[in-house]
Amino acid sequence: MTDKSSSNLVPVNIEDEMKVSYLDYAMSVIVSRAIPDVRDGLKPVHRRIIYSMHEAGNHASKPYRKSARIVGDVMGKYHPHGDSAIYDALVRMAQDFSLRLPLVDGQGNFGSMDGDAAAAMRYTESRMAKVSYKLVEDIDKETVSFNPNYDGSEEEPSVLPAMFPNLLVNGSGGIAVGMATNIPPHNLGEVIDACCLYIDNNDIEILDLLEVVKGPDFPTGSMILGISGIRSAYLTGRGSIIMRGRAEIENIGNNRQAIIITEIPYMVNKARLVEKIAEMVKEKRIEGISDLRDESNKNGVRIFIELKKDVVAEVVLNQIYACTQLQTSFGVIMLALKDGLPKVMNLKEVIAAFVSFREVVITNRTIYLLNKARDRAHILLGLTIAVSNIDEIIRIIKASNDSNAAKQELMARQWEALNILPLVKLVDDKAMLNEQGKCNFTEVQAKAILEMRLQRLTAMEKNKLEEDLKNLITEITEYLNILGSRTRLLEILKEELIKVKEEFATPRLTSIEFGEFDQDIEDLIQREEMVVTVTLGGYIKRVPLSSYRAQKRGGKGRSGLSMRDEDITTQVFVGSTHTPMLFFSNIGQVYSLKLYKLPLSNPQGKGRPMVNILPLKANEHITNIMPLPENQDERDNLNIMFATAKGNIRRSDLLDFKKLQSNGKIAIRLDEDDKLIDVKPCKEDEHILLATKAGKALRFPVESLRVIKSRTSDGVRGMKLAKEDSVISMTVLKGISSTKEDRDAYLSVPWEQRLEIAKGEAFNPEELGVSLTAPAIVEMANSEEFILTVTENGFGKRSSAYGYRITDRGGSGIINMDINDKTGLVVGVMPVKMDDELMLITNSGKLIRCKLESVRITGRNTSGVILFKLDDGEKVVSVSLIAETAESEEDSELEEEGLEQSEEV
């Protein structure tokens, strides 16, 4: 290396050089490529395309031109980058599904919502859209500054004098270095109304702007769920907006329905959406779809989803929302360049920046027009003086040797200006007046006089000259008023905005559904009573309650399940499609789910494994499902009572399980040889009844247990068990305040009479032969509960809850049912009402539904009556109650086959 070359080298620290170079690169990307300007809402490439088309005269009123020519002009003059980047930007500005107000009018294939690419630029044609002219209007009036292009051969505008807030109307998106922007499109009319509100009151609150700017207005329509994301975006510049496609449900006959999707969320690929739905159906994550086809055409989107027979369309639609991009979110980052620097702005700041920019544009335009008007008035003043002194003017011209001599003579001569002195003052043309108040022609005026045609000397032309001068003076006066009054300037700004609104505003496409939608999608689900069935093998299903018909006690039943021999039903309960449920597993985890999300089936259907519905771990299975009240306030006042097979109990606050993650939450710690028997909601003034398979029961108050906050506690001893015995049921009863003596006295009244008293029938206390007063008897009758006990061999009975004395927890309990080999062990104990119905399921899947009014009420220490005829080897495995419904009332003709009166044992 020579000394000369080495002397040109400057040693630098590589760390410093990296910092400087990377910062330069980052700012170049931010300012010159990826981030739009808050004033016109355009990135450099879009601005250059619009300006180049305007310069080339490629306006909306002119014929289309090849897109390749437009791209070539932009690339050659202003944007020395790849032609594909320019063409892609041009294509997007022509897509009516990408921009709310397309800025380019394209002819040919400009892509589709399916993600199809546009045709090559040599095939497509383009021109400016009509609204695009509002971006460049007045650009020739020195409204914005110009900068040299990349090689200094041309000049390009640093910003377009946009007459509407394009950043909000069409939105923008881009990824720079270390930052990104994602601004949704809005409705032009709403945005202009917001600008007018801001012009009227610069101190307006953002929430007041939200009264007119309802939210984004996407070109693809669809819906926005809730306003919390909108408020966050407009207040802070950042937020997440939930978008949902629009779908309709149609009846297509034969108990079949179809879902018709007519609008999809913004920027969602329609073809990919259809593929995703098909994929979810194949994976059985979406059930009930029999056919799927895309029937979209030039008239709009139409995705046809045909459903299987008797499938609830709302459920399938919600599954589609949950599993596909038919419902997605738009992350708002309102980042734009303000004064050349990137800044996240709220709605008011964006509008304020635009209004401030338009003030500058109108001011610059007014100054330009004022100067032009004064220049023209200057000439007209000279012509007016010349016409008034035409004879002398002609003499000077005739006496001059040439035009230059004539011009110099005209300029040297002083002319009387008394008759036009007021006009000169209005025009503010001080150059024409000397100290004596006389006028001297300027070179411009002298030249105009020499070029004046003789026809201007006619009387009509003289009058026209004076009229033109007066009109110019009016214009100049108006321009001076604008420049001297900000109020007048803002009036013009508003007038121009309103004109743009009147010409280009369109109705809102995107509707906003108000409310909270975290858990409210079940509002689309029809309220229907469902029977939920759970099997030992971990299968679960829901079946409409109307699918089961009522039978009388002793009937043979109907097939309720179609299962393999090794699978049996373990739990059945009835709830609404809107019922929230907690799922408790064998390892002490708890999960949350709404009932309508369970797979819909028929009485013979097997259902679906719970491992496919809940995120269960290896060797984990659900042991208990607890339906909760639908009312949130009612749930907030409840506790949860846990009961295990070994007799342990624990009282917890239901609020501890209010918010559950998708992967569940620890509910209780269990010993290896113990299992969770039941979990039920309870209140402070209620009682707990634990029942064992050996026919024992223990009743104690809920308030005797303290609330345990630790979810990892295994609780305290609830009941002392004999060897081989275990707890099989936990029942929540009403609290009672009567004494044992009063309860015993009340129970001495025949149960038939007690039921009549509870119905409001008149009675004579003396005839009952008890020491209780009539009000006490009525109160106890109205509060009386009955306990149903069912055994594995189909025996059952109802007993008054008053017969179960209240003791402390931890005892051995009292006899609940007299069991023997004929009755078998107890499988279910629960409180019942007179109008309830009983549902029993056997290990073979057979099911019977009968009214409880046919089950006799007996004493506590009895064996009951036969409820269900069993075949050899058949056992009752599940017991559930069904409240009386419209379906059962309609089914008044009950089956009479195989009915037998059973006798009390």
UniProtKB/Swiss-Prot annotation:
Keywords: ATP-binding, Cytoplasm, DNA-binding, Isomerase, Nucleotide-binding, Topoisomerase. A motif (GyrA-box) lies at residues 551-557. Its EC number is 5.6.2.2. One of its GO terms (molecular function) is DNA binding. GO terms for cellular component: chromosome; cytoplasm; DNA topoisomerase type II (double strand cut, ATP-hydrolyzing) complex. It is found in: Cytoplasm. Its main location: cytoplasm. Residues 35-524 form the Topo IIA-type catalytic domain. It catalyses: ATP-dependent breakage, passage and rejoining of double-stranded DNA. Residues 886-905 have a biased composition (Acidic residues). Belongs to the type II topoisomerase GyrA/ParC subunit family. A type II topoisomerase that negatively supercoils closed circular double-stranded (ds) DNA in an ATP-dependent manner to modulate DNA topology and maintain chromosomes in an underwound state. Negative supercoiling favors strand separation, and DNA replication, transcription, recombination and repair, all of which involve strand separation. Also able to catalyze the interconversion of other topological isomers of dsDNA rings, including catenanes and knotted rings. Type II topoisomerases break and join 2 DNA strands simultaneously in an ATP-dependent manner. Heterotetramer, composed of two GyrA and two GyrB chains. In the heterotetramer, GyrA contains the active site tyrosine that forms a transient covalent intermediate with DNA, while GyrB binds cofactors and catalyzes ATP hydrolysis. This is DNA gyrase subunit A. The lineage of its organism: Bacteria, Pseudomonadati, Pseudomonadota, Alphaproteobacteria, Rickettsiales. The gene is gyrA.
